[in-house]
Design a protein with these regions (language model features):
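Beta-propeller blade signature
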Residues: 109-117, 158-165, 214-221
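Short glycine/acidic-enriched loop and turn motifs that connect beta-strands
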Residues: 49-53, 100-105, 149-154, 207-211, ...
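A short beta-strand motif characteristic of beta-propeller blades
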Residues: 26-29, 64-77, 121-127, 169-183, ...
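Bacterial N-terminal signal peptides
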Residues: 10-21
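Residue position within the beta-strands of beta-propeller blades
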Residues: 46, 97, 146-147, 202-203, ...
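Short loop/turn segments that connect beta-strands within beta-propeller blades
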Residues: 60-63, 116-120, 164-168, 220-224, ...
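Short coil/turn segments that connect the beta-strands within blades of beta-propeller domains
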Residues: 41-42, 91-93, 140-142, 197-199, ...
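Repeated scaffold domains used in trafficking and secretory/extracellular systems
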Residues: 29-39, 75-87, 130-138, 180-193, ...
Length: 274
């Protein structure tokens, strides 16, 4: 995947997105989601901030079944511009809370809370130097994937990082497509789909407003590996309504814009087949 380089200020990019009707937080992140549901769908978690603390609730069938309050302001991280919620491990046992997005550019420090959903108890607090946002959690709950932004003048340039939850440290190696290790990653997340067991996390990115081709970032959350798949061009005005659909057998990922299948990706070869 060849990425065109353009020196547009991140703020200009975000203003353009807002003007197009896209819902997102100010800064390099999509913002926070109101709640996130377990894969089973029977329990939903919310995070409300007030007076310097955050109250997390587990809700089933409209009733609060558990509640806990933690110091600091945190929320359910969104992972796409449409506000799709993230934060839960695939097995639903770990909830990652993130700080609200910054309104003043890149932060010098990022914090995350790790909460056990069994008793809504605090597992750990992660503090990292720099601007980091939530991306995904591996199925074995060993790895927390983060998106790191390092440019103050180009907020859509990013790198994927891995945090070892057992060793409690950020790994030095950046998660890149080994087929093109020197590429620069840039774009904004539009849609996401995850395989049944959470091994593969697929995210559709746009390169708006430079007109570059959109791409799917395929993360193997177990192997700590990533692959980028270039897609055919289609009008930027339509990409914000795009969605990813994973076949029930996991063998094909369909990129749709409205009723149109823009691309079909073979998940074994990670190539566009039609």
């Amino acid at each position: 995947m060849r990425i065109p380089r353009w020196p547009v200020l991140g703020a200009v990019v975000l203003v353009a997105m807002v003007a197009s009707g896209v819902a997102l937080g100010v800064g390099p992140w999509p913002g926070l989601a109101p709640s996130v549901a377990a894969s089973s769908g029977d329990v939903r978690y919310t995070a409300a901030r007030a007076h310097g603390s955050t109250t997390v609730k587990a809700i089933r069938a409209g009733s609060v079944i558990a509640s806990a309050t933690f110091a600091g302001a945190y929320g359910i991280p969104a992972v796409t511009s449409a506000g799709k919620a993230g934060g839960l491990s695939p097995d639903g046992r770990l909830l990652v809370l993130a700080e609200p997005p910054s309104y003043k550019g890149l932060r010098s420090e990022s914090r995350f809370l790790l909460v056990s959903t069994g008793a809504l108890s605090l597992v750990d607090t992660i503090v990292l130097k720099g601007e980091f946002g939530f991306d995904a959690v591996s199925p074995d709950r060993r790895t927390l994937y983060l998106i790191q932004h390092v440019s103050r003048t180009d907020l859509v340039t990013y790198v994927v990082r891995a945090y070892d939850l057992r060793a409690k440290r950020l790994l030095a190696r950046v998660i890149v497509d080994k087929r093109e290790p020197g590429e620069t990653m840039r774009g904004y997340p539009v849609a996401r789909a995850t395989s049944a067991r959470g091994v593969w996390v697929y995210t559709l990115y746009t390169r708006s407003p430079d007109g570059g081709r959109p791409f799917v970032h395929a993360l193997n959350a177990v192997a700590r590996a990533a692959f980028c798949i270039d897609l055919p061009r289609w009008p930027n005005r339509d990409i914000w309504d795009a969605r990813l659909e994973l076949a029930s057998d996991g063998r094909q990922l369909v990129v749709r814009s409205g009723a149109t299948a823009v691309a079909r990706i073979d998940t074994a070869s990670l190539t566009v087949v039609r």
